[in-house]
Structure formats: C-alpha cells, structure tokens
Amino acid sequence: MHFENSSYLMLFVSEVVVDSTFNKIPKGLLSPACVLQYNRIVLTRIVPPRDFYYYHEYLAGNPPLEVTEEDFRWRIVGGKRITIQEAPYQVLYGKYCGGTLIAPGWVLTAAHCKTKAGYVYAGSTSRSAAKEYPICAHFIHPYWETSSGHSHDYDYQLLLLEKPIPVTSASRPIAIGSVDDIKNGNIVSVTGWGYLKFKANKMQDILRRVYMPIIDEENCEKMTDGSYDLTSRMFCAGYANGTKDSCQGDSGGPVVYQGKLLGLVSYGLECALPNHPGVYANVPEVRGWIRSVTALPL
C-alpha cells in the first residue's frame, strides 16, 4: 500500500505533542501503518477500521465467580497455572509488566511501567511463545504523579498498537466493568507471569491466576495502619494472612470481576505479606479519560 507524503507524515508525527496525555512515538517504530493509525485515531479522531475498533462481539468474558522504591515497583503468589484461553485479554508489556486488551488496537496498562518498551506480546499461555506487536504511541494519564503527591495515583497508561491484534480464542478484548462492582468481599481474578515470591528474580513462563476478595477502603486502611494513603483511583484486594497476592512482574495486568475489567495491578509492600494486601488502579473511575483518548464507545 502506498501512502502519499509518508515521509512528511512520519516526521510530523514524531515531533508532535498534542497534550500531556501521551509521549512521542517510540523511535524505530514509525512505519506508514503506524502513522496512519496515529493520525486517524489520535489527531483527527476519525473512526478506525472495524478490525481496529471496539465491537461487543469481540469482548471476552468469564463466567460469574462463585466463589524502599523497589518494594513498590512492578507487582502471582498462591495462584495456579491457566491457559491464555481463560484470560485472552491478558498481554505482556515489555519484559516485566502485564497489560489488558480493551480493543483490538488498544492496551491498558500501568503508568509506572513507563514507556521504554516498544512492544506488547499476546496470544499465548507461554510468555516466551507470545507474538510480538509494535506500539505506536504511549498515553500516560496527565495527572499521574502530579495530582495528590501519591506516587501511584492515576496509575494508567494506554498503548496504541501499530496493527490490531487478531481476535481469536487466545486474544480477545474485555469490557470495562462498573465502579459499583468494587465492593467489599467481591471475588476478583488477577492474572500474570510475575514472580511467585518477592525478589524471586524469575518471571514465570506459564500464565497464572489467583482469586482474591476486594477489601473496602476503611478495612484496608485499618489493616495497613493507614500506610497506603488510598485515593478514589485505588482499591485493595487480598487476604489478611497474606497467602495470595500479585507480585513483581504482574504490574499493569488485569483485575477481573464477572468477566469485566475492574482494575490494574499497581503496587503493594513486597508480595503476600500479612496485613498488606495489593493495591489496584480503579479502571471504571477513569472510563471518561479512556474514552477521550481512544474514542471507544465505552
């Protein structure tokens, strides 16, 4: 396919900064396809092609469930192995973070995962066998680290992909849930390829999942003696005895309730410590920001 004035467009897009919600396109990834998607979606707000957009038949779903600085970096302990078909919305961002597919061409992850990685990996239970997809642009929430002084407030980052990830049983977007579902005792699932214990220095090759109850703000603050300083963009999940938790390498990964995305792995004190549950970024709370960046009909 030929793109007229593609060199001009690539130069223009590599320098443009529309506002503080995103960073420049990673160097080395400025293909004509990437520039086309960037111009169409970000600059002109034209509706992208069907395969790039958010359609309800694409959305994944699980059946309802019945049941120092380094300490706060990255973020499955006490879980079990699963297949990617059980969490087809899960992707790997770079080497040490997770992410969630919210549309064939969009991934949601944590802002603290930074913007150095140029690829996401999807479609495989095995981390080492996942297919590579280039990132066009990173959009970090403009209030991250500037609003409340909390180092993990507004811990959100959107990734625009160069090409849409094909929708299959192993890679499928997930819908965003309701803020009303973030209730004390609701059981959520957390998935990832992260460490099995703090400072294990080994990512897992096979995807894992753990189930944990949400802990409301009042109980979480009591449990942690107020050390977490929670905001409305955060919620806690875990057990008082610390047997199950997310850990290093899980950051940015999905927290799911009844088949819909509620949160992202954000931070915590080490992993699976008693009385120190994990803290997760509240995704429904920033639905409007996600809509404003992606133009998805959320």
Label each PLM-derived region with a short phrase.
Residues 2-7, 11-298:
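Extracellular "complement/coagulation-type" protease architecture
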